[in-house]
Amino acid sequence: MAGHSKWHNIQARKSVQDAKKSKFFTKVTKELMLAARAGGADTALNQRLKSAIAAAKAVNLPKDKIDQAIKKGTGELAGENLEEVLYEGYGPGGVAILVEAATDNRNRTVAEVRHLLSKGGGAMGESGCVSWMFSQKGVFSFPKTFTEDQLMEVGLEHGAEEIMDEGEVWEVHCAPADFEPLRAAFEAAGMVSEDAEVAMVPANMVALDLEAGQKLLKLIDMLEDNEDVQKVHSNADLPDEMFG
């Protein structure tokens, strides 16, 4: 099960993002609404909502705001008429970029995303141009205080598909449907991950030099600062010198 995806290195930005948690209130609130609308308010039956609540708590969104967003999603309270949209394009160095958005105005959002991609050295593409390069996976990052054998012992029984050595951390992948059961199994065994999310993981990476890597991170930051953008994914393999 050992491997090396290098997907983890672009996640190293999270330490910087965490300093700006307040900007994620809007994003996690939208995800709570969308998740509740899609699968109802019962977290036992709605894994997406369970993950959304965990993400909301991670950025310290108040409980009353969490409850309010869920009620807006189920229709118990009036709320925005949000639509989920996926935009595809290319970034510096020719890397593939996926932009997940939640919007009440498609025309506004597509224009803004197109503008930001162009401004950041990329370009909007047609639907389907890069999404085939990615698979949706549950992704966990564990410190090396745990051994691969320990992770395998718990993971293999609860849906883990792959365990990879990513230098300072172990990375565990699973199918999206197994994400919450696997997280619960790890936590029950006292194995709390440093990071866990359902993400679009690329099949192959595109290596970038320092200049292109810095341009890409600037582009991703611009996209993530847009209030309609929920998540940004790429298949960039960033140089180690960016994280020294």
Curated annotation (Swiss-Prot):
GO biological process terms held by the UniProt record: regulation of DNA-templated transcription
The principal localisation class reads cytoplasm
Query: One MF term from GO for this chain?
Result: DNA binding
Instruction: Identify one Gene Ontology CC term for this UniProt entry.
Output: cytosol
Localization per Swiss-Prot or TrEMBL = Cytoplasm
InterPro entries this protein is in?
Integrase-like_N (IPR017856), TACO1_YebC-like_2nd/3rd_dom (IPR048300), TACO1_YebC_N (IPR049083), Transcrip_reg_TACO1-like (IPR002876), Transcrip_reg_TACO1-like_dom3 (IPR026564), YebC-like (IPR029072)
Q: Does the keyword tRNA-binding apply?
A: no
Question: What's in the keyword line of the UniProt record?
Answer: Cytoplasm, DNA-binding, Transcription, Transcription regulation
Q: Which family does it belong to?
A: Belongs to the TACO1 family.
Name of the protein this chain belongs to: Probable transcriptional regulatory protein DMR_30850
Question: Which organism encodes this protein?
Answer: Solidesulfovibrio magneticus (strain ATCC 700980 / DSM 13731 / RS-1)
